[in-house]
Design a protein with these regions (language model features):
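Residue-level detector of alpha-helical recognition elements and their boundaries
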Residues: 4, 9-10, 67, 95, ...
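Long, low-complexity, compositionally biased intrinsically disordered regions
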Residues: 20-28
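Bacterial Sec-dependent N-terminal signal peptides
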Residues: 1-21
Length: 391
């Protein structure tokens, strides 16, 4: 019995020691240290809607309000989305359906929406008039598109009938039902406003915001209409060389200005679970001869599996102007998401990252924020919006 007891004690001691010994095979992971942070309003949730462009740009403007010394405010996303749907509908009908009518958009839609229609706080116009507490456009977008297509079908050349005078009223009635009637006046923090007077009360100037991009199919230092499906408004961007576009971003952040960021997250280097974006490259120089030879024999899938583990920092691609252009021309870079760059950070290896506020709710691992490497931002930026005073 004594011998058995001693054996059990020895086993338990060995087990405890093993449990306390670090697992040297465990993934190192990414460890970020924030360097520069710009104050922002809380992370929002676009939920089941393709309105990142609105959520991100309004968060960007809310950050600008804070920077200018204003009080925190949650601006109504659905106020802008609803007005934008109406303007999209008018252009869709005018173009005989030969233009994009969808949930997507761009930062310029928001600033022009405020210019034309004012803005209201979220409390005055939540815009969820269909039984949910968050945005859900699964039904709405289908209803709107079907209505517009029916209007056009009823007025084709073969029927020899003009558009009815009722179609805009009918479309607006649908918007009223889903978003709720728009207030002409409202009370906010004890004071009565109209959408226009509320916009005027904010310590920002809509004319201060400009869009910048970097592509070679248009001359540098000129403006051009960026050719992406969600640019239904045909908004223009200033075209700068890549290094100058990146300098604009860096200078803005260094001086306390957030940056509204249009980008592409349909990439293998974008991880939803790790909340990072990278452009990994094989470190061939760091490989021995046998290792390099073995790498060369791997299939593309095997190489991708090795590169996109997101287990620790590694070598990334050096992004060139030509690489950006090729990716844009062949559809590898698309305009599929908008966020706000609001800080900088480094990983444990000293690599530079941008800290980004997303609109996918507060979620792990960084409470709704993401980290994107400098190569990712250089490679996958479609456009940025900045305050012109940050240049």
């Amino acid at each position: 019995m004594k011998k058995l007891l001693l054996t059990l004690v020895a086993f338990c001691a060995a087990f405890t020691a093993a449990a306390q010994t670090p697992d040297t095979t465990a993934a190192e992971g990414y460890r970020f240290t924030d360097v520069k942070l710009i104050p922002m309003t809380p992370v929002k949730d676009q939920s089941r809607s393709g309105t990142c462009w609105c959520y991100s740009t309004l968060s960007f403007l809310e950050g600008e309000i804070l920077r200018a010394g204003g009080a925190p405010v949650h601006l109504s996303e659905m106020w802008i989305v609803r007005h934008t749907f109406m303007e999209k509908a008018v252009k869709y009908i005018r173009m005989h359906g030969e233009i994009n009518f969808a949930e997507g958009g761009a930062s310029r839609d928001v600033t022009e929406g405020i210019r034309n229609y004012g803005i209201v706080p979220f409390e005055a116009y939540p815009g969820f008039n269909y039984g949910t507490e968050k945005a859900d456009f699964h039904e709405l977008s289908r209803v709107l598109k079907a209505y517009l297509d029916a209007v056009m079908e009823a007025s084709t050349k073969s029927s020899n009938k003009p558009l009815s005078t009722a179609w805009k009223r009918g479309f607006n009635a649908i918007l009223d039902e889903y978003f709720g009637p728009m207030p002409e006046t409202f009370t906010y923090q004890g004071k009565e406003y109209t959408p226009q007077t509320f916009a005027a009360s904010l310590p920002i100037d809509i004319d201060d915001y400009i869009d910048i991009s970097s592509f070679t199919h248009h001359p540098f230092y000129t403006q051009f209409i960026i050719e992406v499906p969600d640019n239904w408004m045909w908004g223009t961007v200033y075209n700068l060389p890549l290094d100058e576009m990146m300098a604009v971003v860096d200078n803005a952040l260094e001086n306390g200005y957030p940056v509204a960021w249009g980008t592409d997250v349909s990439e293998k280097g974008f991880s939803r679970t790790k909340a990072i974006g990278i452009v990994p490259a094989a470190d061939l120089e760091g490989m021995g001869g046998t290792e390099a030879e073995r790498w060369g024999k791997l299939t593309q899938k095997e190489k991708d599996d090795a590169l996109y583990k997101f287990d620790k920092p590694g070598k990334e691609l050096d992004i060139t102007q030509e690489m950006r252009q090729v990716a844009f021309d062949n559809y590898e870079t698309t305009d599929d998401h908008g966020m706000v760059i609001m800080g900088t950070a480094t990983d444990q290896a000293g690599n530079h990252y941008y800290k980004v506020q997303n609109s996918w709710d507060v979620r792990p691992p960084y409470d709704g924020f993401w980290y994107f490497s400098r190569p990712f931002v250089a490679y996958k930026t479609t456009s940025v919006m900045v305050n012109k005073h940050a240049l």
